[in-house]
């Protein structure tokens, strides 16, 4: 039997209308929809896709448990188990569409599965999605970077000082706001934030003074000198 193909599909930041035509077409033709959550109904990426393609609810769902932990051993076991589950479906000749938030190549746990499946010789393809930082700048109505400015995309593992010392524009993702906001005020930098970009509960904070310290997990700061 010919092996199936794995597609890693970015659904964008939250607005189902920001899903690309290719993402919609792949999801529509796939035999199996894989999601990075052991409880599919709680998966943000799947819920976004369902708003664009309600018929996905009739497809076979493959939940992949991706634990929120910093324990490297637990993560490696989860990645191995997730890749094995995907390969089992591919061995059955199924086309698998793995849905992931934003773009699959930007801080996505999908990549750890993709690497394992591709290394095992299975056909794979990554379908890009609209990154959250591009959608956030658009929602705020501001340029992300211009006039030769450097752009730094910074995960929450960086300290505020490390991030703010970088030149140009900084995008701070999933950061520690109670620690970051005082550092921002002291630096004199300009900052804006989008919480839950593209989702129904999206909130825009165009200035540093408006940014609350208790914003949610899906918050993104754009910092300019």
What are these regions (language model features)?
Residues 6, 163-225:
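A contiguous loop/helix-start segment that scaffolds small-molecule binding in enzyme catalytic cores
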Residues 105-166, 212:
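Class I SAM-dependent methyltransferase SAM-binding "motif I" and its flanking Rossmann-like core
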Residues 13-16, 39-40, 157-159, 174-178:
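Short beta->alpha connector loops
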């Amino acid at each position: 039997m010919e092996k199936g193909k794995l597609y890693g599909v970015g659904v964008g930041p939250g607005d189902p209308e920001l899903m690309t035509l290719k993402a919609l077409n792949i999801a529509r033709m796939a035999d199996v929809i894989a999601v990075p959550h052991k409880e599919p109904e709680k998966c943000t990426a799947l819920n976004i896709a369902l708003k664009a393609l309600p018929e996905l609810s009739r497809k076979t769902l493959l939940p992949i448990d991706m634990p929120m932990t910093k324990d490297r051993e637990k993560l490696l076991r989860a990645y191995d188990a997730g890749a094995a589950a995907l390969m089992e479906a591919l061995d059955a000749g199924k086309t698998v569409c793995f849905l992931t938030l934003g773009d699959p190549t930007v801080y996505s746990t999908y990549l750890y599965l993709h690497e394992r499946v591709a290394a095992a010789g299975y056909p794979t393809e990554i379908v890009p999605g609209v990154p959250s930082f591009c959608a956030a700048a658009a929602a705020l109505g501001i340029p992300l970077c211009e006039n030769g400015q450097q752009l730094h995309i910074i995960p929450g593992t960086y300290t505020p000082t490390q991030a703010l010392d970088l030149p140009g524009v900084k995008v701070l993702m999933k950061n520690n706001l109670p620690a970051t906001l005082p550092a921002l005020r002291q630096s004199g930098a300009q900052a804006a934030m989008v919480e839950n970009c593209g989702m129904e509960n999206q909130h825009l904070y165009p200035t540093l003074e408006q940014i609350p310290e208790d914003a949610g997990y899906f918050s993104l700061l754009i910092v300019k000198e």
